[in-house]
Amino acid sequence: MLNTLLVVGFGGFIGAILRMFSINLVNKFFPYSISLGTLFVNVLGSFIIGLLFSYAQNKGLSPLLKSFISTGFLGAFTTFSTFSYQNLLLLQSGNYLHFALNIILNVFLCLFAAWLGFIIFK
């Protein structure tokens, strides 16, 4: 159990740092009302989790590695709480078009990315 906790914690540490750098980098080059950095990490994280579970079903993956990637790394790399807060700010500012667009893009692109990642190892 202690090994799992340490592995998840280390994965979370790496995921959180990469999320911060990724969001800042993308938003630096694409400074729009919608945080494309958050969209990027959510889509990429959805793709990676699709790959992970498809690979695990077909080839097998140790429970420790699965915990490291899915719970640790991806749990910290992707961010629904930031997504929710950003949407709240768009809604409060009356920016309804960007509010709707941000929700639609995040939900559909993340679902598509997870599906795409999943079918790669099918």
Swiss-Prot record:
Chain residues that bind Na(+):
G75, T78
Q: Where in the cell is it found?
A: Cell inner membrane
**A Pfam family in this protein?**
CRCB
Q: Which cysteines are cross-linked by disulfides? A: none
Identify one Gene Ontology CC term for this UniProt entry.
plasma membrane
Reactions that this protein is recorded to catalyse? fluoride(in) = fluoride(out)
Q: Which biological process, per GO, is one annotated for this protein?
A: cellular detoxification of fluoride
Which parts pass through the membrane? Answer: 6-26, 33-53, 60-80, 101-121
Q: InterPro entries, per this entry? A: FluC
Q: Which PANTHER family match?
A: FLUORIDE EXPORT PROTEIN 1-RELATED
Q: Which HAMAP family match?
A: FluC (MF_00454)
**Physiological role:** Fluoride-specific ion channel. Important for reducing fluoride concentration in the cell, thus reducing its toxicity.
The protein's name in its UniProt record: Fluoride-specific ion channel FluC
What organism does the record attribute this protein to?
Answer: Campylobacter jejuni subsp. jejuni serotype O:6 (strain 81116 / NCTC 11828)
